Regions:
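Active-site neighborhoods and metal-handling regions in enzymes and metal-associated proteins
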Residues: 1-254
């Protein structure tokens, strides 16, 4: 396992990339409404990243991915490909943004609701959000990856939901997906010991039904096997000398 420790200069570049990724999510919210296609949302984000931000959308052509963002609607767990699908009132959509600026990546996602959300969708999103933060709050030098996973898993399962196991968080920096893998389940005190200067994503995918998923024939889109809803939130996080720093906070939370 090759886990990179970021220098202070690299940490500053990660802060910039993280803020830009969060700014895209701040910007796109007003466009998430009935009748818009996921492809149109992708184009708006692409133009904003490449034009306004003078940055690079990391997903575009990454291992053959054809678009600049991921849009995962309702029972889509992750890596949904934007296209002709029109959003309708009641839909829940995760928008996942990764930008590259000055060689470094910032990666974050949020849930958005189209019109009035269903009660279960709103609750599922809230549990995913809370679980992400419970995991993040475990991060500090001397803590372990298993501390993050256990905190997330316990909270999700307490709510009678389930944690997806096939997909996880990851180290991030000059490379989109670096070591280590950040599992959203596990046992406290196990796994890699955290050190100051590590940067990684925490991004639990939480299913309303069972945890099992399947990959669609497009090779990217992951859906729940039981066709029930899924929700996800994601932040890029730096381990600091005293704890953690979230690099992808939206403007309202900075």
């Amino acid at each position: 396992m090759n886990v990179t420790i970021k220098t202070p200069e690299e940490q500053d570049k990660m802060r910039i990339a993280g803020r830009l990724a969060a700014d895209v999510l701040d910007m796109i919210g007003e466009y998430v409404k009935p009748g818009v296609t996921t492809g149109e949302l992708d184009q708006i984000c692409h133009d904003y990243i490449t034009g306004t931000q003078d940055a690079i959308p990391a997903p575009l052509n990454y291992r053959g991915f054809p678009k600049s963002i991921c849009t995962s609607v309702n029972h889509v767990v992750c890596h949904g490909i934007p296209g002709e699908r029109k959003l309708k009132s009641g839909d829940a959509v995760n928008i996942d943004i990764t930008v590259i600026k000055d060689g470094f990546h910032g990666d974050t996602s949020r849930m958005f609701f189209v019109g009035k959300p269903a009660i279960q969708a709103e609750r599922l999103s809230q549990v995913a959000f809370e679980s992400m933060w419970l995991g993040i709050r475990q991060m500090a030098p001397g803590k372990f990856l298993g501390d993050i996973g256990e905190a997330i898993q316990k909270n999700v399962e307490k709510q009678r939901f389930s944690v997806v196991r096939e997909y996880c968080g990851h180290g991030i920096g000059r490379v989109f997906h670096e070591d280590p893998q950040v599992l959203h389940y596990g046992r406290a005190g196990t796994g890699l010991e955290l050190r100051a200067g590590m940067t990684m994503t925490v991004e639990p995918m939480v299913n309303a039904g069972k945890r099992h998923v399947r990959l669609l024939p497009d090779g990217w889109t992951v859906v729940t096997k039981d066709h029930k809803l899924s929700a996800q939130w994601e932040h890029t996080v730096l381990v600091t000398d005293s704890g953690f720093e979230v690099l992808t906070l939206g403007a309202a939370d900075r």
